[in-house]
């Protein structure tokens, strides 16, 4: 899946250079040209997520804490890109009388609800509804739930994290489900989300969890695109950032 893979974006190519005004005959600086583009927040944020994803992987051998910090930033950006994708799609593709149902920032809906409603707002596709009990939707719900648990932390008992040390005074690592003592009362679902294995403890997030997150997001984009008969990504609509050069008037 290449829904968010980088697309070269430069203003120094020949198409741009050929339109720039040369220096005037007096040898002075040319008049300034105005460059106008339409930003795709999905594309922008997804590329940022990929960069932090890569940096987290590179940092892992040097410092797990630094790697985890980068991983948390990457996950937040992956989720933000998902939100940008569906809100932009609602505006670009949706019926004008329904767009505000899911794309009004003054009345935000839970992200998973927006994914559910988008096919109906667009008003076309092979089916008006999505089976959210089938993969990748339960996994996508867990990715979103993890982000929500960071922004809506809940009471202390919902914020507990568990670690394991081989001996007193030794360094400690996040406790994995199979490492929990049988008589500890620690349930596996208190440590990780059951379908994705993503850790509930933000400090336990590692690069391989980002691999899972990206795979889930890309799978959700593919599934939604199929439901919309390809309208979501047709002609790279979701990533396209067209550029116009407005040359100065002589």
For the regions a protein language model found, what residue spans apply to each?
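Charged alpha-helical initiation segments
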Residues: 1-72, 238-249
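Polyanionic, low-complexity intrinsically disordered segments
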Residues: 29-42, 47, 155-250
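Charged, amphipathic alpha-helical oligomerization/scaffolding segments
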Residues: 48, 77, 81, 138-149, ...
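Surface-exposed polar/charged interaction patches
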Residues: 52-55, 59-62, 92, 96, ...
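A structural signal for well-ordered alpha-helices, especially hydrophobic packing surfaces
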Residues: 53-56, 60, 85-86, 147-154, ...
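Short, hydrophobic, well-ordered secondary-structure elements
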Residues: 67-93
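Flexible secondary-structure boundary motifs
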Residues: 87, 91-188
């Amino acid at each position: 899946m290449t829904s968010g893979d980088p697309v070269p974006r430069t203003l120094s190519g020949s198409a741009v250079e050929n339109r720039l005004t040369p220096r005037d005959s007096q040898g002075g600086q040319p008049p300034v040209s105005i460059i106008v583009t339409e930003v795709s927040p999905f594309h922008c944020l997804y590329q940022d997520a990929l960069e932090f994803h890569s940096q987290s992987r590179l940092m892992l051998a040097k410092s797990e804490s630094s790697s985890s910090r980068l991983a948390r930033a990457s996950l937040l950006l992956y989720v933000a890109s998902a939100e940008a994708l569906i809100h932009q799609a609602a505006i670009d593709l949706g019926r004008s009388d329904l767009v505000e149902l899911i794309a009004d920032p003054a009345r935000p809906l839970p992200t998973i609800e927006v994914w559910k409603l988008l096919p109906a707002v667009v008003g076309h596709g092979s089916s008006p509804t999505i089976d959210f009990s089938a993969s990748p939707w339960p996994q996508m719900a867990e990715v979103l739930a993890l982000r929500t648990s960071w922004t809506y932390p809940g009471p202390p008992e919902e914020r507990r994290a568990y670690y394991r040390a081989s001996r007193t005074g030794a360094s400690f690592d996040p406790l994995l489900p199979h490492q929990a003592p049988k008589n500890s009362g620690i349930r596996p679902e208190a440590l990780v989300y059951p379908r994705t294995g993503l850790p509930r403890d933000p400090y336990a997030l590692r690069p391989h969890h980002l691999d899972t997150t990206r795979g889930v997001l890309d799978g959700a984009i593919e599934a939604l695109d199929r439901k919309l008969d390809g309208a979501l990504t047709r002609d790279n609509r979701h990533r396209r950032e067209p550029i116009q050069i407005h040359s100065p008037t002589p």
